[in-house]
Regions:
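Short loop/turn motifs that cap or connect beta-strands within the blades
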Residues: 32-33, 73-75, 115-118, 159-162, ...
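Beta-rich, blade/repeat-based domains predominating
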Residues: 35-46, 76-89, 120-134, 163-175, ...
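Conserved beta-strand positions in repeat-built beta-propeller and related beta-rich domains
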Residues: 51-56, 92-99, 137-143, 179-184, ...
Length: 322
């Protein structure tokens, strides 16, 4: 494990305007995972460990941050997991594209249960998942699919997405609404959680490439704009967008996550950095990787910690507030 102390002064050195009142003194640490794992998504687990998808090794990875040790749980033949989240049952739920199924891993027994997609959707290219307030899992598939799994009954339903290919990130708002973004389709979507119908919302301008989405505590939707290097905020009630450009990046805004204090975390492929955006002061702070080509594709956190997967370096990264 490698630790680096970082502060907002690093952001100032990059020419950013970070307000001193919102500056974050932080410790950045890195944890190596097995070579060739290509960790794609992460999920801080209830027991203090961290789950990650070892995409190129067909496994769910488990990191113990106290010891730095990792464990891999094989998900099945030809597995190629993408996303992982913590379910209401405290289990790991995975979008498992290789087997075209949603996978559940019991953290106690390590048992793997698969929920295959309907045969009408044979190659969804599963991406990301979220749970609604009723305990139903909703998922996206980049080949033009979105759907849901009822863990109680095991029933899996899927629908064709508007405008075909592109569904990517997905989120649940505090009031239980479910939204996803379409990278190739260049729009965001609200799902009717009863009927499964999809209602499209256009971005503030064409060609932004919405990649991931997260809701804050007020129900505002924060969206990473991959093609333009911007972060957008959509107010579903007022139907109004606001947009902020990432400093010095014309493209490459990938992952997004809003923490328990409504601070917005992003990853910037162009700057090879994790970014923190304070909506109150409208300022950015930068936490660049110590290695080239980090390629952090997804981030999640718990109070005081922001975790990401450096798919390009076979490491997990955590930013801890000091």
């Amino acid at each position: 494990m490698l630790r680096i102390i970082a502060t907002a002064f690093a952001a100032l050195a990059l020419g950013l305007s970070a307000a001193s009142s919102g500056a974050l003194a932080a410790q950045v640490s890195y944890f190596a995972v097995p070579k060739g794992a290509h960790p794609h998504d992460v999920a801080p687990a209830p027991d203090g460990k961290v789950w990650y998808t070892a995409q190129h090794q067909g496994a769910l990875g488990i990191l113990d941050p106290k010891t730095g040790k990792t464990e891999h749980i094989a998900l099945g033949p030809n597995a190629r997991p993408h996303g992982v989240i913590v379910g209401p049952d405290r289990a790991a739920w995975i979008t498992e594209g290789g087997q075209n199924a949603i996978a559940r891993v019991d953290p106690a027994t390590r048992a793997v249960t698969l929920f295959p997609l309907p045969k009408e959707f044979p190659d969804a290219n599963l991406n990301t998942a979220t749970f609604d307030r009723k305990g139903i899992l909703w998922f996206t598939g980049q080949n033009g699919v979105y759907g849901r799994v009822d863990p109680a009954s095991g029933k899996v339903e899927a629908w064709k997405s508007p405008k075909g290919r592109g569904p990517y990130g997905i989120t649940t708002t505090p009031n239980g609404d479910v939204w996803y973004v379409s990278l190739a389709g260049d729009h965001i979507v609200k799902i009717d959680t009863v009927s499964g119908d999809a209602a499209m919302v256009q971005p503030p301008k064409p060609g932004v490439g919405p990649r991931r989405i997260w809701s804050d505590s007020k129900g505002f939707l924060w969206v990473s704009f991959w093609h333009t290097g911007e972060v957008g905020r959509y107010d579903p009630n007022a139907k109004v967008w606001r947009v902020w450009a990432l400093p010095k990046s014309g493209s490459g805004c990938y992952a997004i996550y809003v923490d328990d204090r409504d601070k917005v975390w992003l990853t910037d492929f162009t700057a090879n950095a994790i970014m923190r955006f304070d909506p109150a002061s409208e300022t950015f702070e930068s936490f660049p990787s110590d290695r080239r080509g980090a390629a952090v594709r997804q981030i999640l956190g718990r109070p005081g910690e922001l975790w990401g997967a450096e798919s390009g370096t076979d490491r997990l990264v955590v930013v801890r507030e000091e």
